[in-house]
UniProtKB/Swiss-Prot annotation:
One of its GO terms (molecular function) is chalcone isomerase activity. This is Chalcone--flavanone isomerase. The gene is CHI. It comes from Allium cepa. Keywords: Flavonoid biosynthesis, Isomerase. Part of the biosynthetic pathway for all classes of flavonoids, a large class of secondary plant metabolites, many of which are brightly colored. Belongs to the chalcone isomerase family. GO terms for biological process: flavonoid biosynthetic process.
Amino acid sequence: MEAVTKLDVEGTAFDSVIIPPGSSKTHFLGGAGVRGLEIGGKFIAFTAIGIYLETDSIPFLADKWKGKTGEELAGSLDFFRDICTGPFEKFTNVTMILPLTGEQYSEKVTENCVAYWKAIGIYTDAEASAVDKFKQAFKPESFPPGSSILFTHTPSGTLKIAFSKDGSVSKDEGVLIENKALTQAVLESIIGEHGVSPAAKLSIASRLSEIMNKVGNVEEKLPVLS
């Protein structure tokens, strides 16, 4: 199927299908895009991000969103919210274009999460503990160009964090953090209302629109890893 293809973002290749660390389920590439900032009139790319969805996501999302254009999906906060909170696994591959320390990355992500939780009144001791575990997981890490942060987001609320120095996806599930709010918020920080990668959001909207409109049985149509 044409929509389920691999993508290249600033020289980083994202495979069309993978099995995430610590998972037995096949995920397809929902979309990918760059994260960057306009600095001095020039766009500087920091990371390339690929978002993968478990194949079971398509029937769930199609029930509400089939028939919508990519443009309509791209402009819908509810669509991306349904991806972040839906009852299926998600996998996020954040690959470095420029070098970054683990502390730099974790501070920025958790700062945004905590601000959001406090604003909606759900910041409790459980979230504070999860944030601390998240920071500790990243503290000793350093990410040169080409290295990756690998997040598996389970519907039960477990966030699995693994690291790769060469961009490969290992089978080691890495660090586990049991907190549903954090599991969802890490993905929302990328594709949510104030997500850091508008390019990834556009990519997901375009590709999922095509997949939902053309695929009847996703298990039959999507390629499956042996």
